[in-house]
Amino acid sequence: MPTYNKFYYRPLPEYLMLGASSIEGTGVFATAELKTDFDLGMTHLKVPILNGYVRTPLGGFVNHTDEANCYLVEKLDWDDYRVFHLYTLRPIKKGEELTLNYHLDEA
C-alpha cells in the first residue's frame, strides 16, 4: 500500500468525514472541533464550458435541515469563475453533522 502523499487528491479535508446520517443517507461530519465562520472548503464551482456547476464531495453530501449549522458564501476564483464555500454558523463539535438550509431566501 502506498504511503500518503500530501499532494494526492483528497476529496474531503482531514477535519471532515462521511458517515451515516440520521437526516438522510450519508452526511458530512466534523472530526475535530471547528470554530464559527470556519471555511470548510469548496462545495460547487461554475464551469462555463459545461454551462453549469460541478459539485465537490463536500457539496454532494451536506444534508438539509431548517436548523442548519453552516452557510454558503459565493466567491470568485483566480479566473473569475463563481465558486461556493461552506462556512460554519457556530462552533461545531467533533462528531457533529454539518448541515445547510437548502431553501433560498425570498426577496
Q: How would you name each of these model-derived features?
A:
Residues 1-107:
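Conserved catalytic SET/PR domain of SAM-dependent protein methyltransferases, capturing the structural core
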